[in-house]
Amino acid sequence: MAKFETIAAEDRARAGKGVARATRRAGKVPAVIYGAKQEPTLIALDPRIVLREMKRGGWRSRLYEIETASGKARALMRDIQLHPVTDQPEHVDFQRLAAGEPVRVAVNVNFLNELISVGMKRGGVLNVVRHAVEVLCDPDHIPDHFEADLGPLDINDNIRWSDLKGTGEAKPTITDRDFVIATIAPPTVVAEAAPAEGAAAAPAKGAAKGAAKGGKK
């Protein structure tokens, strides 16, 4: 299961644009934790934490335990608003997690045994359709990742949702089909270019001279 990462934050007493601007002037990023049928919790974050998570990637599916002086909250980072000119974080939205209340989250797919894949050894090309799968699951059972075994796949074979390992209690948001995760495509064959029509029709240099001499009477 995925692990919660702890981040420190400060409590904010009030909401509003003026208060948010004051928070930014103080060198902090205003944020809110909402959901789980509770009142929103107003907090302020160190901008370096937000920038670090943005650079790491995958922050929308990472699990956080937010610690403030008033307590702790488990949450997903759902949105980061950036300044239109500086690209510095201006506001962060977190979704509060509650045990027993399913959440929608994207889980990354790890592809295994690519080097020993039957199809890859024959020159096939791995075509990844989904690097991550959006699922619904309990916050306490969110998988860290799914695994796709490429070892037995030949050319034109594919991996579907039902082939993934580590899905556990996660349910995909796509429910109408056993959707494709990746496929081993045939190798690309580059055909030799045909000679241009004019070049094909042009006679050899020697033949052209012979024809010219033979034409004189």
UniProtKB/Swiss-Prot annotation:
<dbReference type="GO" id="GO:0022625">
    <property type="term" value="C:cytosolic large ribosomal subunit"/>
</dbReference>
<keyword id="KW-0689">Ribosomal protein</keyword>
<feature type="compositionally biased region" description="Low complexity">
    <location>
        <begin position="195"/>
        <end position="211"/>
    </location>
</feature>
<dbReference type="GO" id="GO:0003735">
    <property type="term" value="F:structural constituent of ribosome"/>
</dbReference>
<dbReference type="InterPro" id="IPR037121">
    <property type="entry name" value="Ribosomal_bL25_C"/>
</dbReference>
<comment type="function">
    <text>This is one of the proteins that binds to the 5S RNA in the ribosome where it forms part of the central protuberance.</text>
</comment>
<dbReference type="GO" id="GO:0008097">
    <property type="term" value="F:5S rRNA binding"/>
</dbReference>
<protein>
    <recommendedName>
        <fullName>Large ribosomal subunit protein bL25</fullName>
    </recommendedName>
</protein>
<keyword id="KW-0687">Ribonucleoprotein</keyword>
<keyword id="KW-0694">RNA-binding</keyword>
<feature type="region of interest" description="Disordered">
    <location>
        <begin position="195"/>
        <end position="217"/>
    </location>
</feature>
<dbReference type="InterPro" id="IPR011035">
    <property type="entry name" value="Ribosomal_bL25/Gln-tRNA_synth"/>
</dbReference>
<dbReference type="InterPro" id="IPR020930">
    <property type="entry name" value="Ribosomal_uL5_bac-type"/>
</dbReference>
<dbReference type="InterPro" id="IPR020056">
    <property type="entry name" value="Rbsml_bL25/Gln-tRNA_synth_N"/>
</dbReference>
<comment type="subunit">
    <text>Part of the 50S ribosomal subunit; part of the 5S rRNA/L5/L18/L25 subcomplex. Contacts the 5S rRNA. Binds to the 5S rRNA independently of L5 and L18.</text>
</comment>
<dbReference type="GO" id="GO:0006412">
    <property type="term" value="P:translation"/>
</dbReference>
<dbReference type="Pfam" id="PF14693">
    <property type="entry name" value="Ribosomal_TL5_C"/>
</dbReference>
<dbReference type="InterPro" id="IPR001021">
    <property type="entry name" value="Ribosomal_bL25_long"/>
</dbReference>
<dbReference type="InterPro" id="IPR029751">
    <property type="entry name" value="Ribosomal_L25_dom"/>
</dbReference>
<comment type="similarity">
    <text>Belongs to the bacterial ribosomal protein bL25 family. CTC subfamily.</text>
</comment>
<dbReference type="Pfam" id="PF01386">
    <property type="entry name" value="Ribosomal_L25p"/>
</dbReference>
<dbReference type="InterPro" id="IPR020057">
    <property type="entry name" value="Ribosomal_bL25_b-dom"/>
</dbReference>
<keyword id="KW-0699">rRNA-binding</keyword>
